[in-house]
Amino acid sequence: MSLFDWFADRRKGQYVGKVNQEPDEGDGLWSKCPECGQVVYRKDLLSNASVCGNCGYHHRIDSTERIAVLVDPNSFVPMDQELQPTDPLGFKDRRAYADRLRETQASTGLRDGVITGLCEVEGIPMALAVMDFRFMGGSMGSVVGEKITRLVEVATAKKLPLLIVCASGGARMQEGMLSLMQMAKISGALERHREAGVLYMPLLTHPTTGGVTASFAMLGDLILAEPKALIGFAGRRVIEQTLREKLPDNFQTAEYLQEHGFVDSIVPRTQLRSTLASLLRLHGCESRVASS
């Protein structure tokens, strides 16, 4: 729906002044693309998996939206929903970690920064973990690590292919060494999954950085990424200051990493489900309907 059509529907029979004026995004009906500046009717944007129809920019989406885009309707069965983070170090910077947790849980409706569960993609059973950047920047703490590890172990036991959707700033500093240990714990579980001969694919979305990049995000049999996703370990400014040289403009993008062999395929969000299904079938995974 175009801006003109929307005004026509809303104000039939009324004089409309300043028709070309951009609508207020604050009303929740419109979204402005940060890439091309196009103002899009929000319902149209959501119906296109939050991808700009004008320039292809991938807007950030939360874990619930991500699951809806990826899996068959009503097929997702969540796991370990009761797990909740604590504050073992009594950490406090400008604010107490416990207060940050409570506020973030209230604003997002999540207990921590990842949702895990079993699902189907075009009828093919799969294990799925989806990180949510809204929860403290998608940072990886003890609960995130535990939930992903448990999911990997279930996938290994049931011989299920596994997809982890990465969206994270890295390890959660408020949990110190406990958060860093999740890198090794998840990596160990993934190695056992690999030894069992089962497919694992990480999907790198914007942004995937820090300890997540340094562990399970780069351990896949096939590494997928969304277009123009920021992927890296340290930040661009830190690297430039360390090397004392200017980095390429597209440095740490999905396209740059694919060009240099770190990413196998860049898949537009609107094609993800069909692409996943094709890859799963290519690796011998069958749908429940076909197998029955």
Curated annotation (Swiss-Prot):
Residues 29-292 form the CoA carboxyltransferase N-terminal domain. Transmembrane segments: none annotated. Its cofactor is Zn(2+). It comes from the Bacteria. Keywords: ATP-binding, Cytoplasm, Fatty acid biosynthesis, Fatty acid metabolism, Lipid biosynthesis, Lipid metabolism, Metal-binding, Nucleotide-binding, Transferase, Zinc, Zinc-finger. It is an enzyme of class 2 (transferase). Binds 1 zinc ion per subunit. Its EC number is 2.1.3.15. One of its GO terms (cellular component) is acetyl-CoA carboxylase complex. Zn(2+) binds at C33, C36, C52, C55. Disulfide bonds: none annotated. It catalyses: N(6)-carboxybiotinyl-L-lysyl-[protein] + acetyl-CoA = N(6)-biotinyl-L-lysyl-[protein] + malonyl-CoA. Pathway: Lipid metabolism; malonyl-CoA biosynthesis; malonyl-CoA from acetyl-CoA: step 1/1. It is found in: Cytoplasm. SUPFAM superfamilies: ClpP/crotonase (SSF52096). Belongs to the AccD/PCCB family. Acetyl-CoA carboxylase is a heterohexamer composed of biotin carboxyl carrier protein (AccB), biotin carboxylase (AccC) and two subunits each of ACCase subunit alpha (AccA) and ACCase subunit beta (AccD). Component of the acetyl coenzyme A carboxylase (ACC) complex. Biotin carboxylase (BC) catalyzes the carboxylation of biotin on its carrier protein (BCCP) and then the CO(2) group is transferred by the transcarboxylase to acetyl-CoA to form malonyl-CoA. This is Acetyl-coenzyme A carboxylase carboxyl transferase subunit beta. It comes from Synechococcus sp. (strain CC9311).
